[in-house]
Amino acid sequence: NWARIRRWAMTNGYHFATGQCGVVSGGGPATSSNHPVVKIGWYDAVKFCNARSQFEGLMPTYYTTAGQTNVYKSNVVDLTSACVNWNANGYRLPTEAEWEKAARGGMTAREYPWGDALAASNALYAAAGTSNVASYAANGYGVRDAAGNAAEWCWDWSGSYADRTAANPTGPATGTVRVVRGGSWSNASAGLRCAARASLVPASSNTVVGLRCVRR
């Protein structure tokens, strides 16, 4: 999907500065197109969600202003919640709260998406690079790769949980770093916990962070 949609997007007004399919030892891209996208910054991850929406004939989610008239396709724009059509049927990044609920798969008190113990058969971690997506069993909600392989950008600016509203929080209104969840192929076991949190400057891209598109 990444290469096909990216090619279409680049001829339809989109611009991406980052992104590659998977990573092998040494940092190069994987030879298989079934690896997760990595080396993608937050801005490009958001734009890709819009591109995938339009490619599939769905309503895009992200706009450059609160008026929601111009679809976000290029440049660096620090979007606010008002720039998001939360009711659109297109793709977007999950909020941090949505990500954790989906990752837990209905098990609210467990360390990992599958339980409290971690084995090599559960997820890809402490490895030399990415692997094919969906190589490991799904959790109780049918979600795969919520832990390991590629960490995932979330919508939210990073902030204290105390600042969140109780229902369907979308994170702080402003910030300097965006939330990253899930742990990756390079993490040790602690980074794969459902509650583990990380954050990065949204313009940054590296070989451990990718994205997961979600929709209503």
Where are these regions (language model features)?
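Low-complexity Ser/Thr/Gly/Asn-rich repetitive segments
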Residues: 112, 214-215
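A short glycine-rich, aromatic-capped structural motif
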Residues: 1-17, 36-53, 97, 148, ...
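Functional-site microenvironments in short loops/helix caps that host divalent-cation chemistry
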Residues: 31, 40-198, 205-207
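Short glycine/proline-rich turn/loop motifs
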Residues: 10-34, 128, 193-198
